[in-house]
């Protein structure tokens, strides 16, 4: 698939094959440069479903929305772009339905988690220890606390907890201690390079330094953007929005997210048999969903060679079951 300077989307064919199956509303909650959205709309057009479908693209980043608008121009009449967080998708869907009188069912939702290559490679965003820039890390450049705010104001124990919990970094206490000592001695952190230097001073060996830097920057990014809390809300709201036979796909890039998605999808797809030992003949509640992917889908070796970012990606998909008397053709308001 052709791509532009924003970023090369991961597992495009797999996402499209698993999600773009029927006419309806499709949500790309992490629109980015619009690569996945373009592929989904292209597939719907080839299947003759374009005129009976609507794609809603959501992103916090106004630059991403501008990039995606250009890419999705061939489908402009069937695309709506909204600035916001994907945890707000239920409200966004309802707003568009009311505004346009749209009664199509929600048949597909995609969340491609993590930071885009464009954001990582843009120094002013402060996501990478490889790029000199302000220590920011906000997905929404206009809102909330930055990473600098956290490292400068958090107590040492709180900072250590963030680094350990969200980065799974074993030297979290030593790194937090060094960060707060640096604040006391030299003042507030402002640049990514300043934080990177402190981490390197604590961790010995180049390879270990690189791993610790990745973990510390990941931990701060997750904390700044409340990524796990946002994901939890989005999983609940997204599955609630789906019509029968509708599917939700989530692509994660680190173990914290993947474990959360795996656990949530498993719980949604299992019958409720009540407390252990009761010995019920029938479940108290039948599962309303089924797993489409029993194991996570990973990128092919060929794709990883072309796009190394795909190496850590894990895609999981769940489908809402059709209850007796229900159909995906039912109209939802």
Swiss-Prot record:
Keywords: Cytoplasm, Methyltransferase, rRNA processing, S-adenosyl-L-methionine, Transferase. One of its GO terms (molecular function) is rRNA (cytosine-N4-)-methyltransferase activity. Pfam families: Methyltransf_5. Belongs to the methyltransferase superfamily. RsmH family. It is an enzyme of class 2 (transferase). Its EC number is 2.1.1.199. It is found in: Cytoplasm. This is Ribosomal RNA small subunit methyltransferase H. GO terms for biological process: rRNA base methylation. It comes from Prosthecochloris aestuarii (strain DSM 271 / SK 413). SUPFAM superfamilies: Putative methyltransferase TM0872, insert domain, S-adenosyl-L-methionine-dependent methyltransferases. It catalyses: cytidine(1402) in 16S rRNA + S-adenosyl-L-methionine = N(4)-methylcytidine(1402) in 16S rRNA + S-adenosyl-L-homocysteine + H(+).
């Amino acid at each position: 698939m052709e791509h532009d300077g924003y970023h090369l989307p991961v597992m495009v064919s797999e996402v499209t094959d698993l999600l773009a199956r029927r006419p309806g509303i499709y949500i790309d909650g992490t629109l980015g440069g619009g690569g996945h959205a373009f592929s989904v709309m292209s597939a719907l057009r080839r299947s003759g479903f374009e005129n009976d479908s609507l794609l809603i693209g959501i992103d916090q980043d106004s630059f991403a929305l501008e990039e995606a608008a250009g890419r999705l121009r061939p489908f402009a009449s069937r695309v709506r772009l909204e600035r916001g967080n994907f945890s707000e998708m239920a409200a966004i869907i309802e707003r568009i339905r009311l505004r346009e009188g749209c009664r199509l069912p929600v048949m597909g939702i995609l969340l491609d988690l993590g930071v885009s290559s464009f954001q990582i490679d843009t120094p002013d965003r402060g996501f990478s220890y490889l790029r000199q820039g302000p220590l920011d890390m906000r997905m929404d450049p206009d809102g909330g606390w930055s990473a600098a705010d956290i490292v400068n104001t958090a107590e040492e124990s709180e900072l250590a907890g963030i680094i350990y919990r969200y980065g799974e970094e074993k030297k979290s206490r030593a790194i937090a201690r060094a960060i707060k000592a640096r604040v006391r001695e030299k003042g507030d952190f402002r640049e990514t390079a300043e934080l990177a230097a402190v981490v390197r001073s604590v961790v010995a060996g180049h390879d270990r330094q690189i791993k610790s830097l990745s973990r510390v920057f990941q931990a701060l990014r997750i904390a700044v953007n409340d990524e796990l809390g946002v994901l939890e809300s989005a999983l609940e709201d997204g599955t609630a929005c789906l019509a029968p036979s509708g599917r939700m796909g989530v692509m994660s890039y680190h173990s914290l997210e993947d474990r959360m998605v795996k656990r949530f999808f498993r719980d949604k797809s299992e019958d409720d048999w009540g407390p252990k030992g009761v010995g019920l003949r029938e479940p108290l509640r039948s599962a309303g969903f089924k797993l489409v992917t029993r194991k996570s889908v990973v990128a092919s070796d060929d794709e990883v060679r072309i796009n190394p970012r795909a190496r850590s990606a894990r895609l999981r998909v769940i489908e809402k079951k059709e209850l007796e008397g229900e159909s995906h053709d039912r109209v939802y308001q």
